Amino acid sequence: MDHYCTVRDMNHGIKPKDGPVLVTGASRGVGSIAAMILASMGYRVTASTGRPEEAAWLYKTVGVEEIINRSELASPGKPLQKERWAAAIDTVGSHTLCNACAGVRYGSIVAACGMAQGMDLMGNVAPFILRGVTLKGIDSVMFAKEKRAAIWQQAVQYLPESRMDSLTTVYPLSDAITVAEKLLSGGIRGRAVIQCS
């Protein structure tokens, strides 16, 4: 649900013609789904990933138009950087989130919904007070159940079940520990679902 909330809240008046949207962690669950929804809505997606071996999958299945290596964003950067993206969805946190804020265009929005790199936010106020950038936190935990149902109904038009299946791998409960280890080491592509029955 947080992937669609992220895309919906990210809109902020940003239109596909305004330029590419950065999605960090794009080869993982939330990132790949957010990227696919954006592409389905007509946005050009720049995917940040540390898994170059997933390039063909990101281009063909997810629908991204550009891939950058996560190392470009993973270290401390300048307070303001070249305006590269019309908006950003960050699933990573830490330096990556700070660099996304520093690299979006004037009046843009960055939606933060993850902390794979870390919970720290060691940035500065320059993007917010000099470019009017909005940082929007996405809460998928306390979000009201009724609103979730409405959002899922809207999301289906951009991400039908057949496309969602192309991003999802289902594992038996007996593989949960192995899958968790692979997930923590970056070895899972897309969305991992553990079947409990």
Enumerate the predicted regions with their spans.
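C-terminal hydrophobic helical "lid"/dimerization subdomain
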Residues: 146-197
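Glycine-rich phosphate-binding loop and adjacent beta-alpha segment
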Residues: 95-161, 196
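Alpha-helical segments flanking ligand/cofactor-binding loops in enzyme cores
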Residues: 35-36, 56, 98-101, 126, ...
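Adenosine-nucleotide cofactor-binding segment
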Residues: 39-95
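Short, well-ordered alpha-helical microsegments
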Residues: 31, 55, 97-98, 120-121, ...
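Residues at the starts of beta-strands that form the adenosine-phosphate
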Residues: 20, 43-45, 109, 134
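Short internal alpha-helix immediately C-terminal to a glycine-rich phosphate-binding loop
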Residues: 1-40
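Short, flexible, glycine-rich and Lys/Arg-enriched loop motifs at helix boundaries
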Residues: 10-18, 68-85, 142-143, 163
